[in-house]
């Protein structure tokens, strides 16, 4: 059996994002988005059980035995922060470990566009970061909160499941609350946050109607609210939010959203030529024109508004991909696989 510390050391040296530990398979790392075996010796049930016992608390171990799964985060030997999911499959124990650096990367290190960083300086409003699981949303939001923490005097409350990046208060007071351990749900924590004198609120997942509604209310009442959604692209985010509500409420939500939404950032991570990954962003800054489109149910026009809004820092995903291909950061094949309109993208490249 390979001890867990050795596994984690090797994963960090290879810049792995995840470790998968499953009975009957060798340890598997995710490197630049691809799964790669670490060694050839398959793990046994005794191995994976020992890994779980090294990481988990007694309370969560009880939950795992009762429910067949448990989700938590842990700082391991001052090496790394990990988001851990332990689960049963075919009656055996498996682990999925997401590796998170202890040091929060700066906005500059992540390559966040200036217009995205500028959202952290807004006094109020709703800022959304969207994308699939593993697209770097948590890193982006951590960098934005870190920017606020080192430049402004504000009270930040985060609601996360679990807490991923740990923030040490600098200029700000930061309270990080974990769903399950510190509050019952995102919606409950968000309702409570409104009574805790916050300036900035981070909602780790806007996954249900009540959480979305309360987040919009928090932005309406003068707070800067950051949230995430699993939508693809900034433009699709508006329809996703409005469609979450019953038909009789949609017009009111449309009015509220048009009033409070400041920016939506869609992002994904793609493999670079020569190794490593890079973030690609679609950015919608909510101008008066886009507010009008939201109010008038003309969200189908938003893509055109983004395309012509470069002076505001806006960009479509496909335009960002084209720039990366031109600069030889990613391959054309990678760009085509990620493009929203691959046929149009390919035709544009040929002409």
Residue ranges and their predicted role:
Residues 1-351:
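Short, flexible helix-loop junctions that flank or precede catalytic/ligand sites
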